[in-house]
Amino acid sequence: MSNYDWGYPNTVWFGNGRIKDLAKACKFLDIKKPLFVTDKDLAKTKMVEETLEINKRAKLPTIIFSDLKGNPLGSYVKKGVDVFKNGNHDGVIAFGGGSSLDVGKSIVLQAALNRPLWDCTDGGSFWIENDYVESMAKNRITNPDNVKPFIAVPTTAGTGSETSRAAAIINDETKVKKIVFHPRMLPTLTILDPELTVGMPAFLTATTGMDAFAHNLEAYCAPGYHPMADGIALEGMSLIKKWLAVAVNEGANLEARGHMITSSSMGATAFQKGLGAIHSLSHPVNSLFNVHHGLSNGIFMPYVLTFNRSAIEKKIAKLSEYLSLKEASFNSFVDWVLELKEQIKIPHTISESVKITDQDIEKMSPMALNDPCTPGNPKKPNLDDMVSMYEHSVQGKLF
């Protein structure tokens, strides 16, 4: 695939081997002493070693912060901010999956805020609620120059954190996964290099791909008028339909990898319109059981789809037509989702990934109901509905 530079929703440099332009990106943003944020496992790889060598050759002193892992905690951000400030760093490079990118952008934001990071969370869906202006006014950064440049380099194709203004961080004390949101969390520059995703195992390719699918799907189904988001989500799902299974089965296929990393960025661009109950159900499972976010999204997808049927049937029929499925119908789409999940080995029930008891459901259901993604669900759920969706996902029974 050829190299392309895009200007929406942020500056994006796309193409095979574009990681070689990392030092150029730092120079472009006037970063002279970057903090390199990645997870513990990735920090030990040759891929990170080779990436750091790019900056070394350009005489850019780059320090690694890797005290983090999947489903990131607020304490990771706090440690990162201390390292960032004590090292007098003037920018952040976040390299890795969604967890690394979310921690990286949170470090940049928290370092510039004179208030806790949690003040920029929840309060209703920032995408569709009327308190957006009030929330942002409360958390306005007095001196925008304090927000240092942030370069996002994804090595997975799922979260789309590289093109979003949000981060998912778990509060250490409450064990609740919170959505941190601020306009200044949008990465200053993103490098989309398909070659960096080639090393993903098949199952991780599948689960991150389902995360991208969930972002595009829930953005498309979210209530409200946002034809730009709808258009991006439609094409994102079209790419996923054509290329996800290929990427899973042919890991070295750079064309498939390129389209999947693009669809991931598209999903995060589109979900400024909203997300829904797929994510609401996932977040408690992620924070309490450390289940991979993309995996839980893939598991919950058909249950939420069929729960929402009365609110989205016509829209899903149009989506089925756009995707050239056998029939332009809701049932045809659900059947295809189930077939795709089976093809890429995504479990049908949550019980196949983690043992969930009735007591767990009782604990998680209020968390899901109060999740900031819930207001974006096309069919307004109550507590009993959340309980029911969890129970259906345990039993493998669609609505």
Question: What are the functions of these language-model segments?
Answer:
Residues A23, L52, I63, K78-V81, ...:
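Predominant activation on well-ordered alpha-helical scaffold segments within soluble catalytic domains
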Residues S75-P194:
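Glycine/threonine-rich beta-strand-loop-alpha-helix active-site module
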Residues D360-F399:
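Short, amphipathic C-terminal "tail helix"
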Residues G158, M266-N297, D371-P375:
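Glycine-rich phosphate/pyrophosphate-binding beta-alpha loops
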